Amino acid sequence: MISAIRPAVRSSVRVAPMANTAFRAYSTQDGLKERFAELIPENVEKIKKLRKEKGNTVIGEVILDQAYGGMRGIKGLVWEGSVLDPEEGIRFRGLTIPDLQKQLPHAPGGKEPLPEGLFWLLLTGEIPTDAQVKGLSADWASRAEIPKHVEELIDRCPPTLHPMAQLGIAVNALESESQFTKAYEKGVNKKEYWQYTYEDSMNLIAKLPVIASRIYRNLFKDGKIVGSIDNSLDYSANFASLLGFGDNKEFIELLRLYLTIHADHEGGNVSAHTTKLVGSALSSPFLSLSAGLNGLAGPLHGRANQEVLEWILEMKSKIGSDVTKEDIEKYLWDTLKAGRVVPGYGHAVLRKTDPRYTAQREFALEHMPDYDLFHLVSTIYEVAPKVLTEHGKTKNPWPNVDSHSGVLLQYYGLTEQSYYTVLFGVSRAIGVLPQLIMDRAYGAPIERPKSFSTEKYAELVGLKL
């Protein structure tokens, strides 16, 4: 049984109001679980008030094309952590990516935000102190060990099995450790669901670097295990160490940035929605995230970062890296005329350059300005929007997050493209699991939208087929 939540000493630290965001305070509890427990009654009352007073208010219309077009634009999900504006990009609890880079805690001597701080922000809506983030890092480190049967399961995977498939298998296998499932089977009160979901989520996030690095070392480094979890290090530094990059401070900084900006992107994308959907059936965080990771593995979602780099390397092999804009323009047109897409460009919601792309570009300008692949990516950025606009078949000719990440990883020696989506998966857990905890705390029901056949839709719109 999980022990009762105990009050902790309050902090008096405050942060000043910011433009375009509500006033926010540093969290007032030393422990994340304790602080979230404080917030639950207030947030539940807000939801009750909203539904009681405005529950019958129309919030949007649905046209037939949306039903056949992937449900894009339909307002039908609740996602607290982030909101995506087509013109501005993503905001995490009201904060832009530059806001996160400035205001979330950093590692000593570092410039990039720690993903632990983002997790705290997403769950509470508050910016944690340095001490609170350090405590969260240590908490995750203390939970990182994985069961023997999960180690053996990963080690038995054939080298032909994609890293994302291995990741999904391993996360599913952690179901044996689920506190939520065990508590549910014992008949725990539903008001306590969130506590067990919290514990599972914390354990899962903590174990992902160990799982992900074992997959990497098995597939690409002959199974030689390096590094170990150090309770004094942050999450990204430990992950980098397990991968074999623990001595590279720049790579660790990149990993901090990568894990932060890939974590959350509203709730309607495949991995986020799948995790939330499966969780709504009261499946544990392990089963729910595993389902989300299987969605992330798809080429139209997270696997796109692998395909972008493969395409860039293919371009380089054909036209070289010391190329002109005219060379790239011709190559882009040849790609489009062959019926292929230009990977890394376009987005289901965004209509401007993805701020996550911009953050990675700024990192590259600081750390690798003369790198030939960065030069190639930059030149593509100058040419592709014009070509795609002239081609006329995309609503968004601007680069997305996948357009840049692979090049950064290549620079530091993580060259195995098939592994890139695994890094995305580790990051995505940090973004989607806070919502799963909130769903259980706020009593979110199982999802069950209505579906119709084509014949029924035709009847609804008055058309005889």
UniProtKB/Swiss-Prot annotation:
Residue ranges of the TM segments: none
Temperature-related activity annotation: Optimum temperature is 45 degrees Celsius.
Reaction it catalyzes: propanoyl-CoA + oxaloacetate + H2O = (2S,3S)-2-methylcitrate + CoA + H(+); oxaloacetate + acetyl-CoA + H2O = citrate + CoA + H(+)
Keyword Mitochondrion assigned: yes
Localization: Mitochondrion matrix
Pfam family of the protein (one): Citrate_synt
Main function: Component of the methylcitrate cycle that catalyzes the synthesis of (2S,3S)-2-methylcitrate from propionyl-CoA and oxaloacetate. Plays an important role in detoxification of propionyl-CoA, an inhibitor of both primary and secondary metabolism. Also has citrate synthase activity using as substrates acetyl-CoA and oxaloacetate.
Subunit relationships: Homodimer.
UniProt name for this protein: 2-methylcitrate synthase, mitochondrial
Originating species: Yarrowia lipolytica (strain CLIB 122 / E 150)
Lineage: Eukaryota, Fungi, Dikarya, Ascomycota, Saccharomycotina
